[in-house]
Amino acid sequence: ITNSDYWDSKEDLISPAENIAEGPAPALIEFKNEISEIIWLVSQIKDSIDTMSNVIICRNRATIVLLRMKLSQKGVHATIIDKDQAGFASVKGVYLSTFHAAKGLEFENVFIPFLNEGAYPDSETINSSADQRSALASELKLLYVAVTRSKYGFFMSYHGQLSRLFPSTSSNYQIINGETML
């Protein structure tokens, strides 16, 4: 993410001296459509609900409502986090959060779905800004906040075309064809 053309805060970035995170390599998972992406996401959450704290971080409340409904249909209760709540890192279960509300919190597994062009960055935010490059940089900073919430597993997903905010190549995460995981 910090290798994106839109990242403009290199002076604020502190590179780690060593990699201390445990768990699988971060993953960027591609799907053909939204339905496949949701099926995979719900399946992953169901598999780890009893053993880890899981958060799904979304761009907006409408997406949170959609995912809460999809999880509920599969018998999974998800708690919606607001920005004034305390951390949940040691509490097993499923949480839904916006980028803003996740700031300062940590979870064992972090899922960030719908990182496809058209959904992320938020087109309304970009189009209403006088300075589009600055608006894109702000959207990228929100994503950076979400990325840094994980203590163990970190999974990003999208369907269709990947957001322009991502660098065209990166060695920081593995790219996976999600259709093979269904």
Across the structure, where does each feature detected by a protein language model lie?
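Helicase P-loop NTPase motor core
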Residues: 1-80, 86
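A short beta-strand element within the Helicase C-terminal
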Residues: 93-125, 155-156
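Structural motif
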Residues: 32, 58-62, 99, 115-116, ...
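C-terminal accessory regions
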Residues: 115-182
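A short acidic (Asp/Glu
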Residues: 65-69, 107, 166-168
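Conserved helicase ATPase core of P-loop NTP-dependent helicases/translocases
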Residues: 87-92
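Short, contiguous acidic/charged loop-to-helix segments that flank catalytic cores in large enzymes
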Residues: 59, 84-86, 129-135
